[in-house]
């Protein structure tokens, strides 16, 4: 979220007198469209359902799963509270994970620093100043062991938000499990492993699309045989939404990428029903409760129909759109950060009303820095209050049947399908990205949003209306700069302890496999066990495949 966070700088502020007048105006008028610009009727009724297929909604746990992927939803099991965390060194992040587990979090979600995401070791010139800043620095197997020290990997589910270097980090995770005596069959978790959205919005790509798709498919193929409980790709709309996409664009470009991944796996010889059950999704939750709830309902219906009608899937699990939700980082403001607590709570409510399987709530200070421990705890408590006090988890799809929600669900579905059809017309996701189609659409939506903010037609409380005159500087988390030097020293010590002949042999084996068509995962696991670092493996693959250079899209 850091790279793409929308800013509200330059937006007009108002005086206290103007605030009172604005309050009067707010009582008289309200927005007539959703946050994404979909028109809202003043009142919805039975006529809004005219022409809707009788099976469009159904019941939870049955096709097309509009109302939920399980019959009982949260009555059977609450959503997973998966707070995203990671900073500085493996030792410090390990302490934060233990703290979160002690506070009631049930799973882990790992944030990696930019050098790790981009395939650079901590002592690389490109990494200087970025080590441990926006996530944890992981260079080697020693770091990965430290990260999960005292945390049995067969007792937790771990999500790793990592893309270009996802196969390497997964190899490190598997190697740590082996050292803990944990079988591969017992490992559960997720690698994001979604490169196509990096070309569209986020930008942490290394290799061109073709070898990137090959790496993704290697992970899917290997994991389907070796890690039966592992979600091999978390296909992500979140980052595109953070870059400015509308709700419909978020779903459409996510599903277009998912289609490309499934087609690549099928072309490798895999069966749809062997791989699709381990695909999961990652979406954003914005503050527009009605639109977001409808979006999540539409997502389930669209994916179920795509898998059944387009790919011929017959396994019920292949049809399920299981998704993680994170509240919208780009909706947080640097001004009046206490308002962000309210925003995040409403966003979390939308995720739960929409039937999310897991949820991360952002800390109130994340427009400024990584969250403090206090902020992270409050974010977790927000989820716990929502789960145990708000009364929204006791019935399945509580807004289902609302004329407004059903109409918005249909409208979003229609827009999504039109965008997928246009992507298909261009030749699929990879060709559409090369043509700049999704990038341009998102840029246009982001521009329209910011224009409305700066013009005052879109109210951002505390930014362009209802501005607090008293400005305070909240305490924020800061990364100790000495930690970077410690990480570099630790890396050098690790390198000095290795069997250099074994390291060279394993690196050569990876290069040979990369030039051919052999699955790279076994070679990566052998390599990290021999002592190869993230940067060394990434550097070797750069030699073989080159680096992707983004084209300017206007």
For the regions a protein language model found, what residue spans apply to each?
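Weak global preference for isoleucine
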Residues: 138, 151, 162, 168, ...
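Generic secondary-structure signature for well-ordered alpha-helical cores
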Residues: 106, 149-153, 175-183, 217-229, ...
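Flexible, glycine-rich loop/tail regions that form catalytic "lids" or insertion modules at the edges
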Residues: 4, 22-50, 59, 63-65, ...
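Active-site capping/gating regions of soluble enzymes
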Residues: 236, 252-261, 268, 277-462
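Catalytic alpha/beta active-site cores
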Residues: 2-286, 291-292, 310, 317-326, ...
């Amino acid at each position: 979220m850091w790279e793409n966070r929308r800013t509200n700088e330059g937006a007009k502020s108002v005086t206290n007198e103007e605030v009172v007048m604005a309050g009067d105006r707010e009582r008289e008028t309200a927005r007539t469209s959703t946050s994404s610009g979909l028109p809202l009727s003043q009142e919805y009724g039975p006529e809004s359902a005219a022409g809707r297929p009788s099976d469009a909604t159904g019941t939870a746990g049955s096709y097309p799963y509009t109302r939920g992927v399980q019959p009982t939803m949260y009555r059977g099991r609450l959503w997973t509270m998966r707070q995203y965390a990671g900073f500085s060194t493996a030792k410090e992040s390990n302490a934060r994970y233990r703290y979160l587990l002690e506070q009631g979090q049930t799973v882990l979600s790992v944030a990696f620093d930019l050098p790790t995401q981009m395939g650079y070791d901590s002592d690389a010139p490109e990494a200087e100043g970025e080590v441990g800043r926006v996530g944890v620095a992981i260079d080697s197997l020693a770091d990965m062991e430290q990260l999960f020290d005292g945390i049995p990997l067969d007792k937790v589910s771990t999500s790793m938000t990592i893309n270009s270097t996802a196969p390497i980090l997964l190899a490190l995770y598997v190697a740590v499990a082996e050292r803990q005596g944990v079988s591969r069959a017992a490992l559960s978790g997720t690698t994001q492993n979604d490169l196509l959205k990096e070309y569209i919005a986020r930008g942490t790509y290394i290799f061109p699309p073709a070898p990137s798709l090959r790496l993704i498919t290697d992970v899917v193929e290997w994991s389907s045989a070796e890690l039966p409980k592992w979600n091999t790709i978390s296909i992500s709309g979140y980052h595109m939404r953070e870059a400015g996409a509308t709700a419909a664009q978020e779903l459409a470009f996510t599903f277009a990428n998912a289609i490309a991944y499934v087609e690549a796996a099928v072309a490798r010889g895999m069966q749809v029903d062997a791989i699709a059950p381990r695909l999961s999704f990652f979406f954003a939750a914005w503050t527009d409760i009605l639109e977001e709830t409808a979006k999540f309902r539409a997502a389930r219906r669209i994916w179920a129909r795509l898998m059944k009608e387009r790919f011929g899937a017959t396994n019920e699990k292949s049809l399920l759109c299981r998704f993680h939700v994170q509240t919208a980082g780009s909706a947080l403001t640097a001004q009046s950060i206490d308002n962000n607590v309210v925003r995040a709570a409403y966003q979390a409510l939308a995720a739960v009303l929409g039937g999310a399987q897991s949820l991360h709530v952002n800390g109130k200070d994340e427009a400024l820095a990584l969250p403090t421990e206090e902020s992270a705890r409050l974010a977790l408590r927000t989820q716990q209050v929502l789960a145990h006090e708000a009364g929204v988890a006791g019935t399945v799809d509580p807004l289902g049947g609302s004329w407004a929600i059903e109409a918005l669900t249909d409208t979003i579905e229609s827009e999504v399908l039109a965008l997928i059809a246009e992507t298909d017309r261009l030749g699929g996701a990879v060709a559409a990205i090369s043509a700049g189609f999704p990038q341009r659409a998102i840029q246009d939506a982001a521009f329209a949003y910011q224009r409305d903010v700066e013009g005052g037609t879109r109210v951002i409380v505390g930014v362009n209306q209802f501005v607090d005159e008293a400005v305070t500087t909240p305490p924020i988390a800061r990364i100790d700069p000495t930690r970077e030097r410690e990480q570099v020293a630790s890396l050098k010590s690790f390198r000095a302890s290795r069997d250099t002949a074994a390291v060279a042999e394993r690196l050569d084996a990876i290069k040979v496999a990369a030039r051919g068509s052999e699955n790279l995962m076994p070679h990566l696991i052998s390599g990290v066990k021999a002592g190869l670092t993230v940067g060394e493996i990434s550097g070797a693959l750069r030699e073989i495949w080159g680096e992707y250079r983004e084209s300017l899209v206007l």
